[in-house]
């Protein structure tokens, strides 16, 4: 059996460089909202050398996942991005999966996320990679 003690990893210097919880919930997920999950992760006691990145679910964009809550808006990923980067404990985001960047069904959602990231670009601390 595999056991992952994330709290220990976060507290002890040198165990990990960063953690990236997969917050693959929509803002309105009936089981657990994105914001509630983000709050729980950001309240962990994290060593200053460990960065917290947030994993976003690009593959769920414009899908019927999470009881259809991804169908209500084309700004879910953009709103989650804004929520994440406004949290002082969050160092950035990671998007899963690469295929979402080219998915026709997710194109509006991905474009809105890209726009939100461009509008928030701090050239000293963030990097955006152009989608080709």
List each language-model region with its residue ranges.
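Substrate-binding cleft of secreted/luminal carbohydrate-active enzymes
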Residues: 7-30, 44-131
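Charged helix-capping and loop-helix junction motifs
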Residues: 1-4, 34-39, 75-76
């Amino acid at each position: 059996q595999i056991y992952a003690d994330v709290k220990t990893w976060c507290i002890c210097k040198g165990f990990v460089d960063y953690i990236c919880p997969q917050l693959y919930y929509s803002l309105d997920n009936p089981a657990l909202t994105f914001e509630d999950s983000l709050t729980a992760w950001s309240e962990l006691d994290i060593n200053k050398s460990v960065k917290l990145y947030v994993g976003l679910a690009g593959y769920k964009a414009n899908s019927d996942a999470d009881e259809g809550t991804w169908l209500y808006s084309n700004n879910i990923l953009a709103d989650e991005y804004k929520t994440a980067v406004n949290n002082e404990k969050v160092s950035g985001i990671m998007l899963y999966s690469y295929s979402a960047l080219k998915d026709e069904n997710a194109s509006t959602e991905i474009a809105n996320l890209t726009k939100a990231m461009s509008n928030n670009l701090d050239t000293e601390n963030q990097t955006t990679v152009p989608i080709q």
